[in-house]
Amino acid sequence: SDKKQEGNHMADYSKMKPEEVRELIRKGEITIPTAGMCGGYAQANLVILPKTYADDFREFARKNPKPCPILEIMEGSPEVHDMGEGANLVTDIPKYFIYKNGVKVDEVTDASAYWEDDFVGFLIGCSFSFEEALLKEGIDVRHISMGCNVPMYKSNIQCQPAGVFEGPTVVSMRPMTPENAKKAYEITERYPNVHGCPVHMGDPAEIGIKDIAKPDYGDPVEIREGEIPVFWACGVTPQAAVENAKPPIVITHAPGHMFITD
């Protein structure tokens, strides 16, 4: 199973170079969430959409830099330039979601068949990028220690709308002691390109989350006695906006399954 595969190899993947892991992903040998892989390298969320929607989406990202920090834009070709040498947007992510008219219609490990020449791809910063820094400070990152995907929730924090795109900010959650939460705030503040500091700490209901045990994306994680949930803006936010805007086709990463940059 995925979980077992994860436990066996996660330690090996954490020390590997991004191009090595991307090659294993391209060959279909890694199909699990990428948290904890290639420690110290930024990871990215993906949104690919038809050119006619690209300007609205670029504007949506510009107006919402916390959940949607753009790292690179690829027009007309899935080949990546700055973020990963020799990398390809449609083969180098472990799992993709395909949306048609706002509805998820497919999950694939290779999205080449869906690519069209008038598509534009956006790589957006991901909070997995700063987890290495948290681990170095001795902060337990629960989804890594549990070997599962990070829990993600649609919040009641609304994004600034742009063109056809609007929707809630999706947040990722990591439980920790209040003392570690303060440390995590100070650490992640230094990473504005990958969501920066938390958007909320404590009571999930305050940001519209009814049941912390039922994430909208990813897996639930254990919150231990004396811990509080800490929430960061999350790059799955565009997927919620896509569900509202309903473009004819959109390719995204599957939540938790990231593009690992150089």
Regions found by a protein language model. Give the residues of each.
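Short, Lys/Arg-enriched N-terminal segments with co-localized hydrophobic residues
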Residues: 1-9
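Intrinsic structural disorder
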Residues: 3-4, 72, 148-150, 244
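Residue-identity detector for glutamine
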Residues: 4-5, 43, 158-160, 239
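Metallocofactor- and cofactor-centric catalytic cores in central/energy metabolism, strongly enriched
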Residues: 11-124, 169-240, 244-262
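Aromatic- and glycine-enriched beta-alpha-beta binding-site module
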Residues: 106-163
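A polyampholytic, Gly/Pro-enriched intrinsically disordered region
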Residues: 164-168
